[in-house]
Amino acid sequence: MTIMRKSHPLMKIVNHDFIDLPTPPNISGWWNFGSLLGLCLILQIFTGLFLAMHYTSDTLTAFSSVTHICRDVNYGWLIRYMHANGASLFFMCLYIHIGRGIYYGSYLYTETWNIGILLLFLTMATAFMGYVLPWGQMSFWGATVITNLLSAMPYIGQDLVEWIWGGFSVDKATLTRFFALHFITPFIITAMIMVHLLFLHETGSNNPLGLPSNCGKVPFHPYYTTKDFMGVILLLTLFMTLVLFFPDKLGDPDNYTPANPLNTPPHIKPEWYFLFAYAILRSIPNKLGGVMALAFSILVLALLPYLHTSKQRSLSFRPLSQTLFWMLVSDVIALTWIGGLPVESPYIMIGQVASVLYFSIILIFMPIAGLIENKMLKL
């Protein structure tokens, strides 16, 4: 008699993807972040669902409804802080996941990689809309500044901005539609993740060596379920430490002031996970140029499969490319730091240098390093 997990139509899908999935025997802890992202998404959907039960998407009551959640709802403060810090955790895992993909050459699975970039855009849009919902000072002004960037688009820019706003400024219509979209996008992300996994399981996982491992694959369960569970325990420990001891560490104090269109905060900035892109946007004096650089800072990832010049897939045995990779990581950290600082000297110059370096490493230096390494290794 066949085992139920191998014969039942629904169980067969689960079995194929999470139990009997052939997996390379040597994948390291850097491969844990895919499953951790799944955990973060589940956390965000459930905490968001409970918050939506008490939240009101009206400009007059949005701020006080968030206060009501924290003060009057049973464990409302915990749900609210889990949701707010869960977004930070999500992006931390997401950036590590992308970094691992770049380091080990996972971008050569082009379909999986491109779906991943689409997922990144969707996640960024979801997080941005969520940041607007508490209707604090930074929520309101962040929404005004970031949506207003679309007006830089020739011909249709101003009409597009007014269409998104639902009027001539960020107001009740904007808040209502942002709430509706913020609620639905996680489910679109979930569907896209299914497609992401579908393409990944067509090719199989990459490994640290970047070599085919078909001859030595092992089943996903129990080896990697145990390994992933260890990652889950560590992540939840870090997460609950942040939520229970430092809940406001990653937030902005200005967001504890209700939105006031007549009073502009001294320094408008998005959440920390958007600061690197915000720094690139600010480093170009021209509005349209800045918006294009902002979009291209993410879209440049889609060019990686076509800029791969090395005969080796992974960076494991390529010291020159490794150096450039860690320079890129340092540069993104520097951009994140600069994005949170005021627009004044010397920060403007540092931001411009870091922005040029960001694109130069990806578009020029890494492809050249690949060719040099081929030459040195006589490949």
Swiss-Prot record:
GO CC terms, sorted: mitochondrial inner membrane; respiratory chain complex III
Superkingdom of origin organism: Eukaryota
InterPro entries assigned to the protein according to its UniProt record, in alphabetical order: Cyt_b/b6_C, Cyt_b/b6_C_sf, Cyt_b/b6_N, Cytb/b6-like_sf, Cytochrome_b, Cytochrome_b_C_euk/bac, Cytochrome_b_N_euk/bac, Di-haem_cyt_TM
Subcellular locations according to the entry: Mitochondrion inner membrane
Keywords attached to this entry: Electron transport, Heme, Iron, Membrane, Metal-binding, Mitochondrion, Mitochondrion inner membrane, Respiratory chain, Transmembrane, Transmembrane helix, Transport, Ubiquinone
TM region positions: 33-53, 77-98, 113-133, 178-198, 226-246, 288-308, 320-340, 347-367
Pfam family, one: Cytochrom_B_C
Coiled coil ranges: none
Record-listed heme b b562 binding positions: H83, H182
GO process terms (BP): mitochondrial electron transport, ubiquinol to cytochrome c
Claim: Heme is one of the keywords in the record: yes
Keyword Translocase: no
Homology family: Belongs to the cytochrome b family.
Its biological purpose: Component of the ubiquinol-cytochrome c reductase complex (complex III or cytochrome b-c1 complex) that is part of the mitochondrial respiratory chain. The b-c1 complex mediates electron transfer from ubiquinol to cytochrome c. Contributes to the generation of a proton gradient across the mitochondrial membrane that is then used for ATP synthesis.
Protein name: Cytochrome b
The organism of origin for this protein: Cratogeomys goldmani rubellus (Goldman's pocket gopher)
